Design a protein with these regions (language model features):
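Histidine-rich, glycine-flanked metal-binding segment
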Residues: 1-5, 11-55
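Short coil/turn connectors at secondary-structure junctions
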Residues: 1-2, 40-42, 48, 52-54, ...
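Di-metal (Zn2+ and/or Mg2+/Mn2+) metal-binding site signature of metallo-dependent hydrolases
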Residues: 51-75
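Divalent metal-coordination and catalytic microenvironments
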Residues: 9, 29, 49, 60, ...
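Acidic, glycine-rich active-site loops and adjacent beta-strand->loop/helix elements
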Residues: 62-65, 89-92, 240-242, 267-269
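Short, basic, glycine/proline-bearing loop/turn elements
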Residues: 53-62, 164-167, 265-267
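Divalent-metal coordination cores built from histidine and acidic residues
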Residues: 69-192
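Histidine/acidic residue-rich metal-binding segments in metalloenzymes
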Residues: 131-142, 167-301
């Protein structure tokens, strides 16, 4: 007898094969059988008329604050998501000096419209460095798995302090310090690094996020830090202005480090390049040996 049988559901197994009606048996933490009629289970779920799939991986979320206090991770866990990735778009809460907590909250509130009052009341700030933030996440049991990137906004605020403002130009020493923080974060368990370079992303005070005015040199040096580790994803939201030549440096970075670079491929009023040109330019760089991957939204824009 199996521990659990999910019976009569329409199974989409993720392999690319056509959906089929069948049963799924689970024993312990293992799916032990998939297919036709399966013997009885100690617990059975009638999934007739329902779709049964592997858990969804949501690669672009902003649970950075909520993940420090909420075990349920709603609403994602309500909709079949079993793994979620946060720390996108260059916004998050580590590293964090005590005098920059409010600034980081204002950045997240402005970019993602998450109420600052909820973040201020929910987060305990029992971390300063990025590895300490990962430790804080590890302390809380939750219903889904989480992963996170190191966030550009927090890194710049940590290194530049009060000098951080739109258009601030970090010194070579500043850039080296930022690269070291990112390298330490990835070695500690971060999945990669994220930044934002779009005028649509502003703090609650209306200021552009730090990555929008960052130079390609700064971003490439941070990417090289992940290259030294040997793994990591470089994630970016960008307006893709033609004069920025984003795909040129993304391609160079990917070829140099061997790491993937991913960007938000959207048909947006803020993007100068139409979606078709974004994809075509990405493919041109990939033909040259880069590994640039487009993040596509599942809803229309």
């Amino acid at each position: 007898m199996h521990d659990l049988v999910i019976r009569g559901g329409t199974i989409v197994d993720g392999s690319g094969t056509a959906a089929f009606v069948g049963d799924i048996a689970i024993d312990g933490m293992t799916i032990s059988a998939v297919g036709g009629v399966i013997s009885a289970g100690r617990e059975e779920i009638d999934a007739t008329g329902l779709v049964v799939t592997p858990g969804f991986v949501d690669v672009h979320t902003h649970y950075d604050g909520q993940a420090t206090w909420d075990s349920e991770m709603a609403p994602s866990s309500w909709h079949g998501v079993t793994t979620l990735i946060m720390g996108n778009c260059g916004v998050g809460f580590a590293p964090a000096r005590p005098d920059r907590h409010d600034w980081l909250i204002g950045l997240m509130e402005g970019v993602e419209d998450i109420p600052g009052t909820a973040l201020a009341e929910g987060m305990r700030w029992n971390w300063e460095s990025f590895p300490e933030y990962l430790d804080a996440l590890e302390q809380l049991p939750r219903t889904v798995d989480v992963g996170t990137h190191v966030h550009h906004g927090a890194v710049r605020a940590y290194v530049l302090g009060e000098r951080e403002c739109p258009g601030a130009v970090p010194t070579a020493a500043d850039i080296a310090a930022m690269a070291d923080i990112v390298e330490d974060g990835v070695r500690a368990g971060a999945l990669g690094f994220s930044t934002s370079r779009t005028v649509l992303h502003k703090s609650v005070d209306g200021e552009l996020v730090p990555g929008t005015t960052a130079t390609a040199e700064e971003l490439v040096e941070i990417g090289r830090a992940m290259g030294r580790v040997g793994h990591g994803v470089f994630e970016m939201a960008s307006d893709l202005r033609r004069e920025w030549n984003e795909f040129v440096w993304m391609g160079q970075l990917s070829r140099e480090t061997g790491l993937p670079v991913t960007f938000a491929a959207l048909q947006s009023i803020a993007k100068e390049l139409p979606l078709s040109e974004q994809i075509a330019t990405m493919r041109d760089e990939n033909v040259k040996g880069a590994n640039i991957v487009a993040q596509i939204a599942l809803r229309g824009n």
